[in-house]
Regions:
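Conserved catalytic cores of phosphodiester-cleaving nucleases, focusing on short active-site segments
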Residues: 10, 34-42, 52
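Short His-Asn-centered micro-motif
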Residues: 38-43, 70-74
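Phosphate/oxyanion-binding active-site loops and adjacent basic polyanion-contact surfaces
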Residues: 3-8, 45-48, 115
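A short, structural micro-pattern
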Residues: 4, 32, 84-85
Length: 150
């Protein structure tokens, strides 16, 4: 059997041992079921966005409860539509464009600082996801909504 694996920069999940027995052969492998996956980039541009979007879709097809986040220092996007992807959020941690990064480097200036408020927001987003109750029938009857995603 084939187990597709994908390296992610950061994953929170559960490690499981999977054993498959067929035709007198036994296959065993450790797999990680992700609940949070974060891809880290120096900057995000269209090709990287497309790649991350595809990865987010594949992960969520196996684990719909997983949130997929891209944490990038700089942005190199123009008219792309990241909101149409399965990426839950893209953080631009320096709140600056890639061209600003390159200009600072060329001018021998310090790099942009990472915004600590965004780091706290990222932490709280993950904490909220991990602490959420994903399915509670009594709550659905109270709100009248079952999925209730933001």
């Amino acid at each position: 059997p084939y187990f597709h694996s994908k390296d992610q920069d950061f994953v929170l999940g559960v490690s499981l041992g999977v054993t498959i027995q067929a035709e007198e052969k036994t296959y065993s492998q450790e797999i990680i079921i992700p609940v949070v996956a974060i891809e880290c980039k120096t900057y995000i541009e269209r090709n990287m966005l497309d790649s991350c979007s595809g990865t987010a879709s594949r992960i969520k097809s196996a684990m719909p409860y997983c949130i997929y986040i891209v944490a990038s220092e700089y942005m190199k996007l123009k008219d792309e539509l990241p909101e149409l992807s399965n990426i839950n959020e893209i953080y631009i941690l320096c709140k600056a464009s890639n061209s600003e990064r390159l200009k600072n480097r060329k001018d021998n200036l310090d790099p942009h600082k990472i915004d600590e408020v965004l780091i706290i927001d990222l932490f709280n987003k993950i904490k909220g996801h991990l602490n959420s109750i994903w399915w509670q029938p009594s709550k659905a009857l109270e709100t009248g909504k079952i999925i209730n995603r933001p």
